[in-house]
């Protein structure tokens, strides 16, 4: 059996896997932090504006936690392997601009956009939850758990919004 070098996340391979997913979440959250204020201004329905405002607040908290994780690991985020995700997110945002004159269609597009973004975030967040058994640092574990719980709450809010539109 080979002796793999250990990191605060576990083996080197697990560490790399973990960082790639953390970068993906950070990329998506950074995109949200940048674009949500613009989306908020274009939303028409009060419930949608409320959901966007709550997501802005939650996103800022989650980014701060992820920044702390990077700090604890002595790393900085990298969008190096996130280009496809960035393109996907920007294309979705551009689609919203195409429907800026039709309020109802635009609001539905916003809900669709947020739902797609939520799916991307939650899949990586769930993967990170699986990896937490390998993490040696309890503070990192707690930060991940807090982010995951807050992301789940965002998902519930989004599902309630979708139900209301149905």
Role assignments for model-derived ranges:
Residues 1-166:
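Amphipathic alpha-helical hairpins
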């Amino acid at each position: 059996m080979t002796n793999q070098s250990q990191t605060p996340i576990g083996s080197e391979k697990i560490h790399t896997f973990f960082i790639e997913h953390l970068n993906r979440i950070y990329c998506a959250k950074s995109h949200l932090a940048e674009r949500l204020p613009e989306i908020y201004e274009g939303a028409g329905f009060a419930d949608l504006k409320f959901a966007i405002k709550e997501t802005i607040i939650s996103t800022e908290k989650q980014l701060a936690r992820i920044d702390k994780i990077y700090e604890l690991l002595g790393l900085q985020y990298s969008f190096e392997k996130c280009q496809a995700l960035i393109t996907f997110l920007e294309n979705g945002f551009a689609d919203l601009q195409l429907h800026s004159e039709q309020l109802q269609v635009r609001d539905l597009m916003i809900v669709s956009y947020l739902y797609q973004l939520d799916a991307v975030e939650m899949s990586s967040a769930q993967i990170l939850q699986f990896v937490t058994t390998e993490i040696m640092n309890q503070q990192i574990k707690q930060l991940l758990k807090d982010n995951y719980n807050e992301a789940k709450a965002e998902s519930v809010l989004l599902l309630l919004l979708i139900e209301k539109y149905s």
